[in-house]
């Protein structure tokens, strides 16, 4: 985001979380960022919520569920258990296929408004 500021570059990204997708999560993360100068600095100087923050939050809890389902910390057992794990997180419903890839039904397409230095929502894509 910072690298594109003031340029005429066009960047489009797809993500599994759009800011505003979970008000409770957004409010909590923004309160943390705005209440911690270091967090705000490392967040680019503002309280924009990146999708990776929400997905990182979810992956922590998904990993805990996978460890519980496996009854072990052995990587092979966790991978074996993963297809049976589902989780309703801040970024939506998360499930896994037989190889451990996430099954998601919605992606959000965003672009950068280089003048305002913010992400702009473009469209939502739903799996058919």
Functional labels for PLM-detected ranges:
Residues 1-128:
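Extracytosolic ligand-binding ectodomains
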